[in-house]
């Protein structure tokens, strides 16, 4: 009996609803595009998701590369400052000690003093020897050599 009822219901239902289509005003059945949109939207979602993941990977790699180059520059600057501090300041102090050994006063050294960032301060009242200038030019060459070796490595 249930088979008869289901057959009667099927016959009473218009063919548009049985085929999952809708009837328009002209009573013709129009196919629905919903299954196509569902498959297209899921494909679109997968493409968007893959694009987002790819963009995140590219962004993280570029950020890492920029940070790495920034840290490398900082490391080079720090090494240069450390080199200047370690190699220029002791020479300046040695210049003071040499000046005192030659009979100079504690307040005014007799040789040029090399300060940080390679500025040379001369005492106008004292005589200037050639040796301190040679030491300063040697420091300039040593600093250039260090900068070249740091840049190359």
Curated annotation (Swiss-Prot):
The UniProt transmembrane annotation reads 44-64
Report residues carrying sugar chains: 19, 25
> Which keywords accompany this UniProt record?
Glycoprotein, Membrane, Signal, Transmembrane, Transmembrane helix
| Segment forming the signal sequence | 1-18
InterPro entries, alphabetized: C11orf87
Intracellular or extracellular location(s): Membrane
Q: Which domain of life is it from?
A: Eukaryota
- Is the keyword Zinc in the record? no
Where mainly found?
membrane
Compositional bias, Basic and acidic residues, is annotated for 77-96
Residue numbers on the Extracellular membrane side: 19-43
Could you tell me which residue ranges are on the Cytoplasmic side of the membrane?
Answer: 65-153
Q: One GO CC annotation, please? A: membrane
* Topology within the bilayer: Single-pass type I membrane protein
Q: Where is this region: Disordered?
A: 75-115
Name the record gives this protein: Uncharacterized protein C11orf87 homolog
């Amino acid at each position: 009996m249930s088979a008869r009822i289901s057959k009667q219901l099927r016959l009473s239902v218009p063919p548009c609803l049985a085929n999952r289509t809708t009837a328009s005003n002209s009573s013709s059945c129009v196919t629905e595009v919903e299954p196509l949109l569902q498959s297209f939207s899921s494909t679109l979602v997968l493409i968007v998701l893959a694009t987002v993941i790819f963009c995140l990977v590219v962004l993280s790699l570029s950020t890492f590369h920029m940070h790495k180059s920034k840290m490398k520059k900082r490391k080079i600057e720090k090494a240069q400052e450390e080199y200047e501090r370690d190699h220029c300041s002791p020479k300046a102090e040695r210049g003071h000690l040499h000046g005192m050994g030659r009979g100079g006063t504690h307040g005014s050294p007799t040789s040029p003093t090399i300060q940080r960032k390679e500025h040379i301060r001369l005492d106008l009242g004292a005589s200037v020897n050639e040796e301190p200038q040679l030491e300063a030019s040697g420091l300039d060459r040593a600093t250039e050599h260090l900068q070249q070796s740091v840049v190359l490595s």
